[in-house]
Amino acid sequence: MEVDCENCAGCCVDWRALADVPDHERRGPQAPIDDTYNLVPLTRDDVRAFLDAGLGDALTPRLWAADPDSPSVAVDGREVAAIREKPAFFVGIRKPPKPVAPFDTEGAWLPTCAFLDPETLQCRIHDDPEYPEECAEYPGHNLALGVETECERVEEHVGGDRLLDDEPPAEQSSLLFGPQAVGQKVFAYPDPGDLPAGLVDRLAVGDLTDEDRARFVAVAAASAPGTTAVEPTKREQAYETVLDTDSWVGRAIEEWTDRVGEDAPDPGLGEAVEDSRGAPGTPGWD
């Protein structure tokens, strides 16, 4: 497997507005309630690594609208996909609007991974312990399953050569499906009646509160592989950890959200918004 990532970041940026690509990227058969593009599912170990690194405020949940014939549970009067009558979800990385210019385009405000340097279009945590397993191996799992990669979508709609070698890596982590994924990549919220009013609506419009996100991140961190069980003490500790987190990521997301529409989309703003708050640097391209 070989890819050309320079000046791309198609897997990290919601670039649909640049190429008139209206369809929503989907992972699995059910439609996500949110509209976040290419939200990468984190494993339980990934989630714990982010919490250990003091980056819990970078994480957000995804829930799915239930199909008529699929298991579901009512939350806020809406049927959401469920596992044993518990809302099913995974955890990904938040995508605030950032000024980016992929594919040699003019700068634009686009939803972008919280850890992507808007100027170099490189990941700020690429060599860190919390770098997600799925990101490290992308697009290996897609190639192994014969599923279209984001590299190929960019080639089709923008042009250029991004996927240079489509042979799946000989060694990569095991794919998690069905029961294998429960408690490890797909989680079950144990007490849906405890969810605050309006949560599903806030999720749909991308306006979750810190408390909303912390509830789900804590459940993921306290889950056990292969089961819907959640360890109460670990859950409470993780919840408090997320709420107490005040990282450069969370502060930068707040400023990006305030700046969108007010400032010209200059990728160089990343220095003032992220680097000045302690964001790790990126090497640039040789």
Give the role of each language-model region.
Residues 1-286:
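Short loop/turn segments that flank or connect secondary-structure elements
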